[in-house]
């Protein structure tokens, strides 16, 4: 179920403060975050976030198509190693 429109998008407060601080300084540093639940705002476009996937930090560059989605969508948490091999011997 989607979030109610009247509530607005959820973003952790410290994340907005970090982005505004970087905008004032003019630097282009990576913003390290564990907040996979935060919605990407238009304010974030052009910044690179290091999003934690439970094991390591994945760099995510934010562009305009990502606005409105969550940071966690771009840092996969599971690694697919392929399906198990068939252990039965096939005879013809």
Swiss-Prot record:
InterPro entries: Ribosomal_uS19, Ribosomal_uS19_bac-type, Ribosomal_uS19_CS, Ribosomal_uS19_SF
Disulfide bonding pattern of the chain: none
Entry superkingdom: Bacteria
GO biological process: one example: ribosomal small subunit assembly
GO CC term, one of those recorded: cytoplasm
Keywords, comma-separated and alphabetical: Ribonucleoprotein, Ribosomal protein, RNA-binding, rRNA-binding
Pfam families: Ribosomal_S19
Gene Ontology MF: a single term: structural constituent of ribosome
Function as written in the Swiss-Prot or TrEMBL entry: Protein S19 forms a complex with S13 that binds strongly to the 16S ribosomal RNA.
Protein family according to the UniProt entry: Belongs to the universal ribosomal protein uS19 family.
Name of the protein in question: Small ribosomal subunit protein uS19
Native species: Rickettsia typhi (strain ATCC VR-144 / Wilmington)
Gene: rpsS
């Amino acid at each position: 179920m989607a979030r109610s429109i009247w509530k607005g998008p959820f973003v952790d407060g410290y994340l907005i403060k970090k982005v505004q601080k970087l905008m004032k300084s003019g630097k282009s540093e990576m913003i390290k975050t564990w907040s996979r639940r935060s919605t990407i705002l238009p304010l974030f476009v052009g910044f690179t976030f290091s999003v934690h996937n439970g094991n390591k930090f994945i760099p995510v560059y934010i562009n305009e198509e990502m606005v409105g989605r969550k940071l966690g969508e771009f840092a996969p948490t599971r690694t697919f190693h392929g399906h198990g091999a068939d252990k039965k011997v096939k005879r013809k």
